[in-house]
Amino acid sequence: MGQVLPLVTRQGDRIAIVSGLRTPFARQATAFHGIPTVDLGKMVVGELLARSEIPAEVIEQLVFGQVVQMPEAPNIAREIVLGTGMNVHTDAYSVSRACATSFQAVANVAESLMAGTIRAGIAGGADSSSVLPIGVSKKLAYVLVDVNKARTMSQRLKLFSRLRLRDLMPVPPAVAEYSTGLRMGDTAEQMAKTYGITREQQDALAHRSHQRAAQAWSDGKLKEEVMTAFIPPYKQPLVEDNNIRGNSSLADYAKLRPAFDRKHGTVTAANSTPLTDGATAVILMTESRAKELGLVPLGYLRSYAFTAIDVWQDMLLGPAWSTPLALERAGLTMSELTLIDMHEAFAAQTLANIQLLGSERFAREVLGRAHATGEVDDSKFNVLGGSIAYGHPFAATGARMITQTLHELRRRGGGFGLVTACAAGGLGAAMVLEAE
């Protein structure tokens, strides 16, 4: 076991997560069609503060993230402060770590708490795949800059004459890695082939995810942590996530064609997480500040770890890399965990990470560790379903996982929970949570 790194303030306070809330998650171009990311963020933070009844002046910092950037609101965190009636003096800044963005937001607030610069803060993230920053071609952008500097109409017309019809076409946001040109689904296909993940295994995991998420909603387990969203024209509120397939069968999954490798692939739209809109936020405090306010925390942040690997081959192995480090810093082993929640970007990616967490060879030859991190107990794993079912608003997923895991730990009488995710750029994130 390596060095244990306790997450405590200088006064010995633990980092408490006192509450968490999210919007329902909606598939792209459905319930949140036309609602920009900043409005989703304001929606969830405003409701979180109203429900908590914590005075606005208690919150000293807000760290918030988005992955699909809004050019008109680059510092989304500050816009949320100004748009929710929070104290205008509240410090606010934005972060982005791809699919691990709200993990990063939580870590940043925790670090401010440990440093003693604040005693309470909000962390979260939001994304909209329905309101996208549509760009222009490089040639049109180049010409527009020159046109802005041109002094005469003839100069402007001469510049515009260089353009062709194709240069005027809108350019949607890239869905591929900037450095490699590979789409996330291409990487998932790589991983399926590298680790021998079959189509049947992927479909079975996706089916399991939807079944468990549907059951969680049916049992009322998510009501406390998901707000009702009222959206224009205010005729039909959104109460639940709208991606979950409650009545699907494995036979339904088998009907879909591969989405990326059309000839030989196994990754489909059904065994991948869909493009999604939504927002999530959590309130963190020092343990003593929570006691002063008479608040009972959902739980505590025990440790966290971020890792990075190469992006050319099998880059979505973040959980296999970050989990052993987070467990080491928490002073725990895999067998001591009560719950394990892993982000399901793709079923292939999820199954590959599960395989490597239990691999002695991977531990020795790749991680340089003496033993495997540990086998993933299916009875502890994604017990309420995962991102394939709920959806994945990129910056919101981490905080969803944290809130969901802490509530489930409390229902089980406490214990330790691991939340972990892969992210674009070969990044990985893991956090160990504790509930009493």
Curated annotation (Swiss-Prot):
Reactions catalysed, as given in the entry: an acyl-CoA + acetyl-CoA = a 3-oxoacyl-CoA + CoA
Active-site feature positions: C99 (acyl-thioester intermediate), H392 (proton acceptor), C422 (proton acceptor)
Domain of life of the source: Bacteria
GO cellular component labels: cytosol
Principal place of residence: cytoplasm
Keyword Nucleotide-binding annotated: no
Keywords from the UniProt entry: Acyltransferase, Cytoplasm, Fatty acid metabolism, Lipid degradation, Lipid metabolism, Transferase
One of the protein's GO biological processes: fatty acid beta-oxidation
Enzyme Commission no: 2.3.1.16
Role summary: Catalyzes the final step of fatty acid oxidation in which acetyl-CoA is released and the CoA ester of a fatty acid two carbons shorter is formed.
Cross-referenced NCBIfam families: AcCoA-C-Actrans (TIGR01930), FadI (TIGR02446), PRK08963.1 (NF006516)
The family this protein is said to belong to: Belongs to the thiolase-like superfamily. Thiolase family.
Classification via HAMAP family: FadI
Record-given protein name: 3-ketoacyl-CoA thiolase
Organism of origin: Shigella flexneri
